[in-house]
Amino acid sequence: MTLASVIDDKNYDVGGGKTIKGSKGDVSMRTAIALSLNSCAVQTSDLVTQDVGMEYCEKLGISTLVTNKVVNGKTYSDNAKTLALGGLTDGVYNYELCSAYAAIANNGVYNKPTLYTKVLDHDGNVLLDGTGESHQ
């Protein structure tokens, strides 16, 4: 499957009486991603399997994945159809999501994000200050 692969954005039955709506017809994977077409996302997840989807999320640096979390007697797992739509139990950090999407634009190469507060030269002078501002 490539960004040029074609997928049908159609109403898609996900079981349990639930349907993900789609109406654009045949679109490229690139278009499906750009337009955030939910039907295409879930169809792709079913095609490659949710296990593979979880593996890719791990490879792309998503650190909040849950496989077996019990809260008030209820068990949660991100290894489900909701993964394709971003429905993670504990959410996702924005910088991780940005770096995962950046890998698509970088020919599939993932670069771990680096956050900084300041950059100094060899004499200790501040070259870049990323500490930000706050006010009330």
Go through each PLM region and give its residues.
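Conserved catalytic neighborhood of penicillin-recognizing serine enzymes
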Residues: 2-53, 122-136
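Short acidic/histidine-centered micro-motifs embedded in hydrophobic/aromatic stretches
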Residues: 9-10, 56-60, 118
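A short secondary-structure junction motif
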Residues: 14, 36, 60-64, 107
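Short, charged, amphipathic alpha-helices and their helix-cap/turn boundaries
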Residues: 49-67
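Active-site-proximal helix/loop microenvironment
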Residues: 64-124
